[in-house]
Amino acid sequence: MRATNLTLLTDLYELTMMQGYFKNPTNQTVIFDMFYRVNPCGGSFAITAGLEQMIEYIENLHFETEDIDYLRSLNIFEEDFLEYLSTFRFTGDIYAIPEGTVVFPREPLVKVIAPIMEAQLVETAILNIINHQSLIATKAARVCYAARGDGIMEFGLRRAQGPDAGIYGARAAVIGGCAGTSNVLTGQMFNVPVLGTHAHSWIMSFPDEYTAFKTYAKMYPNSCTLLVDTYDVLKSGVPNAIRVFEEMREEGIKLTHYGIRIDSGDLAYLSKEAYKMLAAAGFDDATISASSDLDEYLIDSLKTQDAKINSWGVGTNLITSSDNPAFGGVYKLAAVKDAGSSTFTPKIKLSENTEKVTNPGNKTVYRIYSKSTGKIKADLICMADEVFDPEETMIIFDPSDTSKKTKVLGGTYELRELLVPVIREGKLVYTSPEVMELREYCKKEQNTLWDESRRLVNPQKVYVDLSQKLYDIKKNLLEEMSEKALD
């Protein structure tokens, strides 16, 4: 947690492969792509996150004396290799899609160009960092979409799978759209709003509910949200909250950020009845917050039922992405450049499952926007040296079905390259935005999606296609591999 050197945050086989390369030197430079194949939670997109922590990992990548001593104790690694590790630094290039960007399956989120030993070592940590935060940012985006503009508070720390998942999950949740977090350490580390009310234990520690409410309101008159379901929401909690609000008003205390929170029961019914009671007392502007094992589906249902809730505390199902607890990012070799060569040789991984056949070569990703609407038409994976003129018509190819291709008419679209340089020759060339800036950027990104692609259930797919050049390279490699298999 908050570690600066995570060099041993790797799988053992990365190190054993490194030693193999060291003992059998080829001096190859390679390209690895980090991408995913299936959108989380049945959606049509993901939100990429974790780049800042990935950069910190790369910048602090080095083996301490105690790391070398530990590796020596495993009786696997030879002394000359351990000596090499003692001076190891990352010297390659990394390109990445910025955090908060809407992304789709099979397009590279991160591209690593480096000597093969360096590129191999960083695989595990890159996947660990990007997979986790992208998952939670995506879940948060879905939850926020379901809330239809209401504020979402991230409340999941106590249910997260450990401190790091709580800290960085909360960071990712804010990038995905949450207004803030209950996690104070995340607030301190990333300068994001920290939010919270009080627990049932606060109410229970006082002789009665009214006294508990009154004491809390006196202490926090400018941020007074009272938890009303400790005993009985409508017979006790809301009446006592109204009594306290009335007394504060009579005392000349201006109520600004105030309201109630309901943490159990029929949230639709209780919120409607509570609103009637608050409105009758002149507090129709009070916030009604809800918690209680919420997720995007329940929030969407409550909004459809016209529940009088305008603030939501979401914990377990957000911080764990409970219905889809893993982001399936992978890290695959795409090209190799031998010592003395000036060009990369494309590499392809085959599979009986066409979805798992990789896209070869040194690639980049362009987003194609409709010029008239600003919405995404498709994403295009192409070779890194390709140049396109938006005034010219372009043919793009479905990566799985060779019979499907799309014509994009010149003059009707705009292009944006998504992969940006982050590390060059081991040196940082990228400035990470603040988390709240990423949150605003992420909102704008999601607005480039068609409404049909933002549906929580059965959304319209956004297509990721290949350029003619990449399509031809992939087709030729597949044919070569098929011929070799027949020999």
Where are these regions (language model features)?
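Ordered alpha/beta subdomains of enzyme catalytic regions
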Residues: 1-222, 249-250, 256, 332-487
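Glycine-rich phosphate/ribose-binding loops and adjacent secondary-structure elements
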Residues: 201-381
